[in-house]
A protein has these predicted regions:
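Extended beta-strand/beta-hairpin segments
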Residues: 247-287
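Catalytic histidine-centered segment of alpha/beta-hydrolase-like enzymes
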Residues: 227-239
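The serine-hydrolase catalytic nucleophile loop
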Residues: 37-50, 65
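Hydrolase active-site cap/lid region
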Residues: 122-171
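Conserved alpha/beta-hydrolase
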Residues: 50-72
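Catalytic nucleophile-loop/oxyanion-hole region of alpha/beta-hydrolase
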Residues: 41-42, 68-99
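Short beta-strand/loop motif that positions the catalytic acidic residue
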Residues: 188-189, 194-196, 200
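N-terminal cap/lid segment of alpha/beta-hydrolase-fold proteins
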Residues: 1-26
């Protein structure tokens, strides 16, 4: 089924731009994908993982947090607390549209936000993180040498992260000090999947260890061998997507046996699998 736009209002009252990836037939569940700090809803990881979940029967909303992407939040200050509220607002908007989510998937800081947000989202059955930091102090290491002084003296600063400017205000630093991520993980008591590359140069593998240890069972860990933090290699993005889809299927209702039949085109139909170069799915009639 073709994707479509989905705009909703953030906790702060700003419109946020989203994209729905519905599955064919009756969804077995709905998920929200939270992008990384320097990404957006159309990043490679966001797109591939959303589409993989859709093929597994799980509909997905990926959206731009306030301050990123093309949504109405563009130009607003980056604020971890608002990211958490944006996730909750997205879930409420989906529920109002008859698509109540039961899965959160977060990449990098989006994974940390998903963990914190899920604590107050009882309908969320499971949380998956990809390259997520185990504490918010980690992001301060990405700031320039004078950024913290500027924020302290002027209340805000334009901070360059991964080549992009982000408006950071004093409230962000207060959130960094005030949120205990590992405590939030320990109190979550929901299935957690931790995915991380041992070669991650942005968020070290030790963060994955801390998240995994703090999580309660059932919990799972998958190593993203040779992947970089942003999953820029399409093969790494596809692998992560496939693993999330398989893992999530254990915590959602089974695929319905009476799914609507997809109209079969005459002749031979080939479609890209998105699993790598030269890989096609070929269908001839009903075969």
């Amino acid at each position: 089924m073709a994707g479509r736009s989905f705009t909703f209002v953030s906790g702060a009252g700003s419109p946020l731009s989203g994209h729905l990836e519905p599955p064919e037939g009756t969804p077995r569940g709905w998920a929200i994908f939270a992008h990384c700090c320097t990404c957006g809803k159309d990043s490679r990881a966001a797109v591939h993982i959303s589409r993989a979940l859709s093929r597994a029967g799980i509909g997905v909303l990926r959206f731009d947090f306030a301050g990123t992407g093309i949504g109405g939040g563009t130009g607003e200050p980056v604020n971890f607390a608002s990211d958490v509220e944006d996730l909750r607002a997205a879930a409420n908007a989906m529920a109002a549209a008859g698509m109540s989510p039961s899965l959160l998937v977060g990449h990098s800081l989006g994974g940390t936000a998903a963990i914190v947000a899920a604590a107050d989202m009882p309908d969320i059955a499971a949380v998956a993180t990809i390259g997520a930091p185990a504490d918010l102090q980690h992001i301060l290491r990405l700031f320039g040498p004078n950024d913290l002084d500027t924020i302290a003296s002027e209340g805000e600063a334009s901070v360059e992260i991964a080549g992009r400017p982000f408006l950071i205000r004093r409230g962000f630093l207060e959130a960094v000090e005030g949120i205990d991520v590992e405590k939030a993980i320990a109190s979550l008591r929901r299935p957690v999947l931790v995915m991380h590359s041992p070669l991650d140069q942005v968020v070290g593998i030790d963060h994955a260890s801390r998240i995994f240890v703090a999580s309660r069972h059932p919990k799972s860990f998958i190593s993203l061998d040779n992947a970089d933090h942003l999953l820029t290699d399409v093969a790494d993005a596809n692998y992560a997507a496939a693993m999330v889809a398989v893992w999530a299927s254990r915590f959602l209702p089974p695929l319905s046996a009476d799914l609507p039949q997809v109209e079969v085109a005459e002749g031979v139909v080939s479609t890209e699998t998105l699993a790598g170069t030269f890989q096609l799915k070929v269908r001839s009639g009903e075969h």
